[in-house]
Swiss-Prot record:
Pfam families assigned: EF-hand_7
GO cellular component: myosin II complex
Protein name: Troponin C
Modified residues (N-acetylthreonine): T1
InterPro entries, per database record: CALM/Myosin/TropC-like, EF-hand-dom_pair, EF_Hand_1_Ca_BS, EF_hand_dom
Domain of life: Eukaryota
Binding site for Ca(2+): D131, D133, S135, T137, E142
Function: Troponin is the central regulatory protein of striated muscle contraction. Tn consists of three components: Tn-I which is the inhibitor of actomyosin ATPase, Tn-T which contains the binding site for tropomyosin and Tn-C. The binding of calcium to Tn-C abolishes the inhibitory action of Tn on actin filaments.
Keywords, in A-Z order: Acetylation, Calcium, Metal-binding, Muscle protein, Repeat
């Protein structure tokens, strides 16, 4: 799969948002300001996710990130949002009766169609883990967990 890249305009907007917070022109911003920078661009990121991402990017534990690291986080968030939209669209298409659930039979067919060539046993295990209440249906959150875990 090709790597996700933000558009030039998105990157310019992200750099501008960074500069708006980097008022002293130090070339870095506090990791504590990342939530506000995301928000200024209309993106909502939970505090715990920002902390995880900051810890990952701030290898020297300075509590600050430079603009390049910020752009990497910005692109990661855009990709996550895109993936979420694609998953929601796939779920919507598969939810033929528009009840907010997919029948397990449909899910079984999807899993058997994936390029990974899952065995029947693997498919049944995945369905059992997903449809924990045995209702024969899977809601969006269960579908999302399954698709993210199977890296489909």
């Amino acid at each position: 799969t090709e790597e996700f890249r933000a558009s030039e305009k998105q990157i310019l907007d992200a750099k501008q948002a960074f500069c708006n917070v980097d008022k002293k022109k130090e070339g870095t911003v506090s990791c504590k300001d990342l939530g506000a920078i995301f928000k200024s661009l209309g993106l909502l990121v939970k505090d715990d996710k920002i902390k995880d991402w900051s810890d990952e990017m701030d290898e020297e534990a300075t509590g600050r990130l430079n603009c390049d690291a910020w752009i990497q986080l910005f692109e990661r968030k855009l990709k996550e949002d895109l993936d979420e939209r694609e998953l929601k669209e796939a779920f919507r298409v598969l939810d033929k009766e528009k009840k907010g659930v997919i029948k397990v039979d449909v899910l079984r067919w999807i899993l058997s169609s994936l390029g990974d060539e899952l065995t029947e046993e693997e498919i049944e295990n995945m369905i059992a883990e997903t449809d924990t209440d045995g209702s024969g249906t899977v809601d969006y959150e269960e579908f999302k967990c399954l698709m993210m875990s199977s890296d489909a």
